[in-house]
């Protein structure tokens, strides 16, 4: 379900403050955050934000096409392995030999 247009997009306040400080200084740096639920707003464009994905921070460079999306969409937390291993260990089941 989409967020109501009456409300502003959700962004954690400390993240907005850090971005505003860097914009005033006209510097680009990596900003670490644990807030995967924050929405990408236009003031974030051009910055690199390291989003926590459960074990480590994944640096993401923000472009204009990402506005309106959540930070967590660009940092996957699960990696699926394909199928089963090629060689399965054999079972030594003595009951079948009786």
Swiss-Prot record:
InterPro entries: Ribosomal_uS19, Ribosomal_uS19_bac-type, Ribosomal_uS19_SF. Gene3D superfamilies: 30s Ribosomal Protein S19, Chain A. SUPFAM superfamilies: Ribosomal protein S19 (SSF54570). GO terms for biological process: ribosomal small subunit assembly; translation. It is found in: Plastid, Chloroplast. One of its GO terms (molecular function) is structural constituent of ribosome. Keywords: Chloroplast, Plastid, Ribonucleoprotein, Ribosomal protein, RNA-binding, rRNA-binding. It comes from the Eukaryota. GO terms for cellular component: chloroplast; mitochondrial small ribosomal subunit. Pfam families: Ribosomal_S19. Protein S19 forms a complex with S13 that binds strongly to the 16S ribosomal RNA. PANTHER family: RIBOSOMAL PROTEIN S19P FAMILY MEMBER, SMALL RIBOSOMAL SUBUNIT PROTEIN US19M. NCBIfam families: rpsS_bact. Belongs to the universal ribosomal protein uS19 family. This is Small ribosomal subunit protein uS19c. The lineage of its organism: Eukaryota, Viridiplantae, Streptophyta, Embryophyta, Tracheophyta. The gene is rps19.
